[in-house]
């Protein structure tokens, strides 16, 4: 577990002391976030908006959850994301109805993964989510999924994911891992708890005898329960791009026969020429959640026609 994960989830006595010392900053941050939410006016768009979000920093499975849910409506769907750590700015149409228009460095790893996993959908990245939504509507999409969209004051269905491992302190950053006050879980239209309303299963494609785990995801420790025996583990910052020569050197040092990577990391390494073993994720979402989403989509459709 990396330092920042230990600090938020399994802090040492020293880290607990640091968290308490930072409490005034945490309270200030939470107050600002709460005030901003209270003063925001809801905005309406002529489309069905469905947000997949969380309250904590780091990964809770938003992207695979979104992919699993959006598959049911794929022909009508656009996905709007910020495109974290991408090498471009502004609005970018990553894919349109299955045709991929950009490369991973410009789109970002998550947007490219969504584009590949939803081959009939349209994927848009934009720091300004409203511009992304309007572009999706312009392209004829009437169901729009927002990746990490909980904080935006739009008229939408809010799905919040609650992770299996929760932060030690129920405080906003920097004392805790929450981006907004934890009580906002109660404001979600759908609250999905990992292990109860959604779960994951992992299968490894192209396994080899000596796999070296290489990953650039927010919480690499969450992979532990799915891992086979590996010869080593290398964790980069979330969304980081890889240096091929560094990976080649690491493989040689560990006498590795392949790199074990997530699907999100695979999109950045497909053209590397390195042998890859990939952790293929299968996502299972409770049928009650799917039924709730169908009901919401059906209720919005007459208003949009």
From Swiss-Prot:
Record bears the keyword Lipid biosynthesis: yes
Residues holding ATP: 56-63
Classification via Pfam families: LpxK (PF02606)
EC code: 2.7.1.130
GO cellular component, as recorded: plasma membrane
Top-level division of the source organism's lineage: Bacteria
Reaction(s) catalysed by this chain's protein: a lipid A disaccharide + ATP = a lipid IVA + ADP + H(+)
Keyword Disulfide bond: no
Pathway assigned to this chain's UniProt record: Glycolipid biosynthesis; lipid IV(A) biosynthesis; lipid IV(A) from (3R)-3-hydroxytetradecanoyl-[acyl-carrier-protein] and UDP-N-acetyl-alpha-D-glucosamine: step 6/6
InterPro entries, sorted: LpxK, P-loop_NTPase
Recorded GO MF terms: ATP binding; tetraacyldisaccharide 4'-kinase activity
Keywords carried by this UniProt record: ATP-binding, Kinase, Lipid A biosynthesis, Lipid biosynthesis, Lipid metabolism, Nucleotide-binding, Transferase
GO biological process: lipid A biosynthetic process; lipopolysaccharide core region biosynthetic process
Family per similarity comment: Belongs to the LpxK family.
NCBIfam families membership: lpxK (TIGR00682), PRK00652.1-5 (NF001892)
Primary role: Transfers the gamma-phosphate of ATP to the 4'-position of a tetraacyldisaccharide 1-phosphate intermediate (termed DS-1-P) to form tetraacyldisaccharide 1,4'-bis-phosphate (lipid IVA).
UniProt cross-references to PANTHER family, sorted A to Z: TETRAACYLDISACCHARIDE 4'-KINASE, TETRAACYLDISACCHARIDE 4'-KINASE, MITOCHONDRIAL-RELATED
Name of protein: Tetraacyldisaccharide 4'-kinase
């Amino acid at each position: 577990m990396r330092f920042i994960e230990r600090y938020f989830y399994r802090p040492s006595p020293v880290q607990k002391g640091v968290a308490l010392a930072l409490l005034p900053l945490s309270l200030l941050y939470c107050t600002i976030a709460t005030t901003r939410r209270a003063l925001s006016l809801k905005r309406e768009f002529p489309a069905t908006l469905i947000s997949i979000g969380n309250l904590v920093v780091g990964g809770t499975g938003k992207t695979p959850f979104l992919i699993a849910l959006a598959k049911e409506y794929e022909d009508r769907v656009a996905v709007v994301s910020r495109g974290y750590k991408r090498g471009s700015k502004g609005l970018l149409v990553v894919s349109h109805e299955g045709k991929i228009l950009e490369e991973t460095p410009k789109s970002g790893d998550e947007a490219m993964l969504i584009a590949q996993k939803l081959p009939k959908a349209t994927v848009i990245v934009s720091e300004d989510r409203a511009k992304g939504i309007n572009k999706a509507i312009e392209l004829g999409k009437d169901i729009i999924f927002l990746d990490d969209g909980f904080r935006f004051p739009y008229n939408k269905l809010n799905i919040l994911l609650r992770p299996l491992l929760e932060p030690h302190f129920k405080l906003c950053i920097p004392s805790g891992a929450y981006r907004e006050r934890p009580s906002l879980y109660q404001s979600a239209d759908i609250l999905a708890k990992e292990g109860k309303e959604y779960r994951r299963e992992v299968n490894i494609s192209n396994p080899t005898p000596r796999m070296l785990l290489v990953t650039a995801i927010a919480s690499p420790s969450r992979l532990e329960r799915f891992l086979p025996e590996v010869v080593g583990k290398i964790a980069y910052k979330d969304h980081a791009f890889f240096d091929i020569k560094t990976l080649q050197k690491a493989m040689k040092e560990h006498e590795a026969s392949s790199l074990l990577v997530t699907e999100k990391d695979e999109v950045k390494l497909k053209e590397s020429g390195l042998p890859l073993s990939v952790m293929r994720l299968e996502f299972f979402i409770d049928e009650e959640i799917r039924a709730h989403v169908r009901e919401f989509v059906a209720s919005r459709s007459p208003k949009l026609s």
